[in-house]
C-alpha cells in the first residue's frame, strides 16, 4: 500500500467528492476586481465575545496576495479559542478552514506551493506559514511542516495586517505562505480540504508503523466530523475491517453507511474492560491493530 504525494492528492479528492458535491462550474475568472478601501473582520476581542470590526485594507507587497473570502468552516479549535483562549491569541480573527478567490497578487507570485501557475481569479486554500529562519526551514526547505515557529491563518494574534483569518471579508496571504490552487472543486469541498488532509496525514503516520495494511483491524474512537472523515479515508485506502466506537446512535448509523464493518455504542457497557471484550468479540478475538 505505497502512497506517494500524487496518490494522496487523489485520495483526498476522492474522499471529498464522495462526501460532498461535484466540481465547481467552469466560469472564466475576471482578471480585475474592484477592491474596497476598507473591509470587515469578525474579531474575537475577549473570551466569548466576537465583534465585527472594519479596517483599511493595506497595500499588498510584492510577495503577498489579497484573497476575497468565499467561505470558512468552523473547527473545534475555533470553539476552544472562543470559549477559553487557551493559546493566548486574543484579539484574533479566527478561521483556518477557509477558501477564497485571489483578487490581487504581488509581482513576485506566479505559482502556488506545488508549482501550479497562479493568476488573479484563481481559488485557493492555505496551509502553514513557515518562518524561513529556524534550523528546519534552513536545512529542510521542502519540509515546511517541520518549521519550529510555523504560523496558521486564523491563529495569528491581531497585528498590522489585520486580515489574518478566514472569518473576514478578505485575507492577506503573507510572504512564505503555503497555498494551493483548487479551481476544480466546489466551495463546500474546498472547505473540507484541511480536515481531510489531517485525516490522510494521520493514516500516513499509522502506516509508517507497519501496523496498517489492507487486512488490518482498525478502531476509530469517536465519529464526529473528523472521525467520520478518517473512516472515509481508511476505507478509501482499501481497509475493510473497521470498527467504530461512539455514544451517538445516529453517528454510528452514518458510520455504517460510510463503510464501518462494526459499530459499538460505548454507553451500553459499564466500563472499559467490557468495551475491550466487545471489541475482541466483533474482531474474532483478534482485537485491533
Regions inferred by a protein language model and the residue ranges of each:
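N-terminal Rossmann-fold NAD(P) dinucleotide-binding loop
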Residues: 227-228
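Short Gly/Pro-enriched turn/cap motifs at secondary-structure boundaries
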Residues: 45, 56-57, 89-95, 158-163, ...
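Adenosine-nucleotide cofactor-binding segment
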Residues: 220-223, 235-289
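Phosphate-coordination loops involved in phosphoryl transfer and adenosine-cofactor binding
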Residues: 38, 212-217, 239, 288
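Glycine-rich beta-strand-centered segment in the early N-terminal region that forms part
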Residues: 56-72, 85-138, 183-185
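NAD(P)H dinucleotide-binding glycine-rich loop of Rossmann-like/cofactor-binding domains
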Residues: 112-113, 133-221
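Protein-protein interaction and targeting regions used for scaffolding, dimerization, and localization
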Residues: 1-35
Amino acid at each position: 500500500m505505497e502512497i506517494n504525494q500524487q496518490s494522496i492528492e487523489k485520495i483526498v479528492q476522492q474522499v471529498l467528492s464522495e462526501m460532498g458535491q461535484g466540481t465547481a462550474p467552469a466560469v472564466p475568472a475576471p482578471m480585475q476586481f474592484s477592491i474596497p478601501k476598507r473591509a470587515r473582520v469578525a474579531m474575537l476581542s475577549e473570551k466569548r465575545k466576537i465583534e465585527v470590526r472594519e479596517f483599511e485594507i493595506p497595500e499588498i507587497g510584492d510577495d503577498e496576495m489579497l484573497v476575497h473570502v468565499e467561505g470558512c468552516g468552523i473547527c473545534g479549535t475555533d470553539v476552544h479559542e472562543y470559549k477559553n483562549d487557551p493559546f493566548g491569541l486574543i484579539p484574533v480573527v479566527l478561521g483556518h478552514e477557509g477558501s477564497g478567490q485571489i483578487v490581487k497578487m504581488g509581482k513576485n507570485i506566479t505559482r502556488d506551493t506545488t508549482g501550479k501557475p497562479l493568476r488573479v481569479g484563481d481559488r485557493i486554500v492555505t496551509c502553514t506559514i513557515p518562518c524561513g529562519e529556524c534550523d528546519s526551514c534552513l536545512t529542510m526547505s521542502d519540509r515546511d511542516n517541520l518549521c519550529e515557529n510555523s504560523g496558521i491563518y486564523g491563529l495569528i494574534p491581531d497585528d498590522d495586517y489585520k486580515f489574518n483569518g478566514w472569518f473576514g471579508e478578505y485575507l492577506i496571504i503573507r510572504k512564505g505562505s503555503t497555498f494551493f490552487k483548487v479551481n476544480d472543486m466546489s466551495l463546500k469541498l474546498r472547505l473540507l480540504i484541511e480536515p481531510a488532509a489531517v485525516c490522510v496525514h494521520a493514516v500516513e503516520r499509522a502506516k509508517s508503523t507497519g501496523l496498517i495494511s489492507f487486512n488490518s483491524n482498525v478502531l476509530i474512537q469517536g465519529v464526529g466530523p473528523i472521525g467520520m472523515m478518517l473512516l472515509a479515508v481508511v476505507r478509501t485506502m482499501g481497509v475493510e475491517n473497521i470498527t467504530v466506537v461512539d455514544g451517538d446512535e445516529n453517528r454510528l448509523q452514518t458510520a455504517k453507511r460510510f463503510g464501518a464493518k462494526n459499530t459499538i455504542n460505548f454507553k451500553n457497557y459499564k466500563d472499559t474492560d467490557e468495551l475491550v471484550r466487545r471489541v475482541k468479540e466483533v474482531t474474532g478475538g483478534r482485537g485491533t491493530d
